[in-house]
């Protein structure tokens, strides 16, 4: 897999691919970033962007991870002291998941977002962005707000200035970040900054086939125990032969196959013995043809996800 193919793997959108190709031709070591609001446990939805950062490192990028403690504070996720502690937990999780620590700069928002230069640029940007535009950007990231605070309207402006002052070439995020990233692309040039390239990953469904929500217990946290993961997978949605919006297949596609060249679905000999797959498309076809039972797929997924998360558990003990 060449450099560009690695970057494009498992992404929903690149804005724009032409600009990305130009960047790769111009810079040997470009810089990409993701900002994480430290507001709770890291789950497999977050890990999707971590996987993309690992791909980018393999493609020669230097990575910046913004641990956005000020953003979390503005978004009412706790005191600055509380979110700083969660940010440190996030950092340890990301390293345990495979980010090369030597090729990653971890930056706390509070280290640079409270300075005069930063705030002046936020104020300049606020003159160019309407209130409705800022609100629409935030509605995509979280739940729609009927009565937002001023701090929540400042949030997307800060995210755009983060991209500028961290001096990154590429902004990475889930597709829910698209409106904020487009705000940055449309306005940073007028403030004297470069226009960022944006890479967006899909939003994964919860294990029950609906949107992930802590109240539903339908997602995998990186510090879940082995027993918890097997329990969650056992009751996960996985209809026989159905490859559309199948959360178990999605875990294989986005989390397992990028880390393993070969996947073995273990089965007793009386049910045909083990199945070996060398690509996700091969596995998807096998499941569509009902060659794989949903429970065998679930058990195999749980086994591999536990292997991936085992280093995280060891770090957090």
Curated annotation (Swiss-Prot):
A motif ('KMSKS' region) lies at residues 211-215. The gene is tyrS. Coiled coil: none annotated. Homodimer. This is Tyrosine--tRNA ligase. L-tyrosine binds at residues 33, 155, 159, 162, 177. One of its GO terms (molecular function) is ATP binding. It is found in: Cytoplasm. ATP binds at residue 214. It comes from Methanosarcina mazei (strain ATCC BAA-159 / DSM 3647 / Goe1 / Go1 / JCM 11833 / OCM 88). It is an enzyme of class 6 (ligase). A motif ('HIGH' region) lies at residues 38-46. Catalyzes the attachment of tyrosine to tRNA(Tyr) in a two-step reaction: tyrosine is first activated by ATP to form Tyr-AMP and then transferred to the acceptor end of tRNA(Tyr). It catalyses: tRNA(Tyr) + L-tyrosine + ATP = L-tyrosyl-tRNA(Tyr) + AMP + diphosphate + H(+). Its main location: cytoplasm. Belongs to the class-I aminoacyl-tRNA synthetase family. TyrS type 3 subfamily.
